[in-house]
């Protein structure tokens, strides 16, 4: 009952909008039973520069979901 | 005169909107003389996932304020 | 041909709007050949507090551009 | 023959007893071929506080198992 | 409603028994509103050696409690 | 279109030759859809010593591949 | 008897003289029961530059004092 | 008189019982004048897994002893 | 006479051969007075994967050269 | 107006006197527009030993100056 | 029987060839009972630059050997 | 000839004067062949507080000396 376990997987989400959207894409694209409840931890934030402008936001997140 | 000191306290702010709002809540909810001028440093960013969606943004910040 | 090098420079961008804007200012203000294509990595996020409110967002980023 | 590889997965184990039990639960609950021989590395230790008492021990571990 | 904040304080607990007891002492000795619900994070583990034997376990923990 | 995500998995490659070979083994032995294009990041480098000589090179790498 | 706890607070001391003086100011300005015996740990060292000269030394220290 | 020095050595202790026992073994097995008074700092915690069960606890500790 | 200073710049070198070659390219491509004597420090090692094979080695190094 | 940027450069200062002097030399020897107002952050402290005595203090600092 | 301990010592190996050779020199030059079986962990990689070329590879490794 | 190795040992020096003196004591008290030429790296700086005043400066340094 009180014995629980959570598995963490590391995902990089990419968005042209902003960092929050990049995180949300990382969460949305995560499959194999990680769509339920859980939490995320931001590990790294990067992005692409094209012609001197930020053109992509990239967020690496650890996504945790309960192990059944 | 030139001898100053600043105290830092660590606070986790939570918001359903975005990371900047979570940081602003951490700053706003901080009491005991920390409402004046100072600065913050982001220590950690996490969040909650419900039904496969980001439902809360959590920012841990160190908030610094002058010691009188 | 396959031998390339990228130089990274560390820049702190400041904005009254939000963290993404602070990053974009760091990228835009970077000179000496770093205006082309490349990438950035967020190193640190801080900000200023005035009268108990966040009044400036400060993002330290490493900006990478190709060495000709 | 001498070419081996090990895959690491990150798991959070939770126990009401102590940290060692939390680690053992993380190991026991790990599935997909990780039940064999291998090793674990403690990444983080946290826990829950209820009514001013520690009520749950949480250990995040990297669990390594041989890739066939 | 959804706007919450948690304050973290750093405490070193000392015990002659074991690490879990040292953590529990850190939690128990924490005052000013931190006696309610919340969580802890282990930051550091050390101890004293007397006559070649471990004679004290010392755990540094961050203790988080809700800001009202 | 611009919404992409990459999953990272952590693998330890072992080789009797050198560190680059250990990294290549980690990449080659990685399964479940990670055989396509992507990148790796070196996390840790270790090795075995037998009779005072290095007899195995071990490289821990994060291997990233696109999530379909 | 053997159950003790120490609380750590983080303080930034500023001095125009040198780093040791900045640390001593951080210790001296710390209030609420931290004036007794204990220890400090240096967390960060920074300073201000005016007209190309170091004009202020800033030391961030964790100051630990016994919890009664 | 007030001039003292302590030497730190890094030792990995292994036990089939638990982490505290692994630390105590590291302290007990340390030779060359480190058997006296001093302190230890936990650097890393790992362990072995056999048939899906934790079969050994391994604690890496820095052990400090006074230099005569 | 005894007052010296060294400037460090961060460069990413890329090679199809191996990590040492990637470091040598980073050193060779570094301009503006850094071609003299000095030293380098490896900061990060990554690489590209194409069709499941390592196709590029990338080494980030800090290159230090004397300030005249 | 409120859009500002600061560039950081990493410099190692060396002095036979003490650490503060090594930092001041790093600041003084820094060229290309970094002579104005700004700040420094200590990154590393090392030194040389000759015949069992400290003969040089070396401080690595990040020096930040406003980008015009 | 199951109570074992390993001592780690930190050694910097230098080679004009490559990083693996630098590591092997660190292992070979290590004395006082560390010539047996054990393992190493790479802690840092640096090198010397002469006339704009890499002229020495330096690897700092922790070398672990069983305590009898 | 070009094959060299340096051994590092970790020492905590204590002084009532200042940090540089604490470092010099760590270097001076180091025995077994470490009295020759080499270098040190500052790992940690702490100190004791008595009656609200800094009464001891403690510097942990890695001291490197050539292996014959």
PLM regions with names:
Chain A
Residues 41, 45-68:
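A cross-kingdom feature marking charged/low-complexity
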Residues 4-40:
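Short, well-ordered alpha-helical segments
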């Amino acid at each position: 009952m009180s014995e629980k376990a959570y598995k963490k997987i590391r995902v990089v989400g990419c968005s042209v909008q902003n960092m929050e959207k990049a995180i949300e894409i990382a969460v949305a694209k995560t499959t194999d039973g990680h769509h339920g409840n859980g939490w995320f931890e931001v590990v790294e934030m990067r992005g692409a520069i094209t012609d001197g402008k930020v053109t992509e936001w990239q967020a690496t997140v650890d996504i945790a979901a309960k192990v059944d």
